[in-house]
Regions:
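Metallo-beta-lactamase
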Residues: 34, 42, 104-105, 111, ...
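Short Gly/Pro-enriched turn/cap motifs at secondary-structure boundaries
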Residues: 16-18, 118-120, 140-142
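Conserved beta-strand hairpin/beta-sheet module of binuclear metal-dependent hydrolase folds
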Residues: 3-55, 150-164
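A structural micro-motif
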Residues: 11, 57, 85-87, 134, ...
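Short secondary-structure boundary segments
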Residues: 39, 66, 92-93, 165-166, ...
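Residue-level detector of beta-strand structural context in well-folded domains
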Residues: 24-26, 121, 126-127, 149
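Active-site HxH/HxHxD metal-binding segment of metal-dependent hydrolases
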Residues: 42-130, 159, 217-227
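Active-site loop signature of alpha/beta-hydrolase-fold enzymes
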Residues: 23, 70, 96, 169, ...
């Protein structure tokens, strides 16, 4: 695939780390709109934080980078708080695993989550989500889950990628859950290493931020995947 690297518009980002396994939820703000990415836990409370952090902004969408319970668990609560007219977006492949993922979380750790409503839009590679004066470009990155995605934004304020649990500093997300694949996730790391500009700020599902440049230097999994991708 090819990405539009024409940098345009401004993007401001608020991160809220929430829940017992410290998931990062992001509020991506552009002009008078905001997109919520990975509302993990306690959706009603997240909606209150959103109103405090982003007053007066219209919520353009709720997007999940993948279908695991610790990234979709707050969707239902946020929709109740914000209104059913706020669209919920997730990849087509991961829309099919949400229910099983919630059951797995309950069995493994005893955490209970509410199943999100049916998605209003199913995302596939190459799709674009426009809001404010920027665009989020969808890159398919299977491996952590069958339908994991990265959301890339070439904004005038800087290149940003919401990478979910595909990439961690010097590592990658776990692949031992249902639908995970070590080969696929390494290939996905190589893919984003090849496609995304080196200065891209990578906003991660759990942990601190990193950049593509830093990972190309230090992440052996990305370097291995890059050889396969090219």
């Amino acid at each position: 695939m090819t990405l539009d690297m024409n940098r345009k518009g401004s993007l401001a980002i608020h991160c809220v780390t929430n829940g017992p396994i410290q998931t990062n939820t992001y509020f991506a703000v552009s002009d008078d709109e905001v997109v919520v990415i990975d509302p993990a836990w306690e959706g009603e409370r997240l909606a209150e934080v959103l109103a405090d952090r982003c007053p007066g902004k219209r919520v353009a969408a709720i997007i999940c980078t993948h279908g695991h319970a610790d990234h979709i668990g707050g969707v239902a609560g946020m929709r109740r708080a914000l209104g059913s007219d706020v669209p919920f977006l997730i990849s087509e492949a991961d829309s099919e695993i949400m229910g099983r993922a919630i059951e797995d979380m309950r069995e493994m750790w005893g955490f209970d989550h509410e199943l999100p409503p049916a998605p209003d839009r199913l995302l596939n590679e190459g799709d674009v989500v426009a809001f404010g004066d920027v665009e989020l470009q969808v890159v398919a990155t299977p491996g952590h889950t069958p339908g994991g995605i990265v959301l890339f934004c070439a904004a005038a304020t800087g290149n940003v990628a919401f990478v979910g649990d595909t990439l961690f500093p010097g590592a990658h997300g776990r692949t031992d859950l249902e639908g995970g694949s070590e080969k696929q996730i390494i290939d996905s790391l190589g893919k984003i290493g090849a496609l995304l500009p080196a200065d891209t700020l990578c906003l991660i599902g759990h942990n601190d931020t990193t950049t593509i440049e830093r990972e190309l230097e230090s992440n052996l999994f990305m370097r291995r995947g890059l050889r396969h991708y090219r």
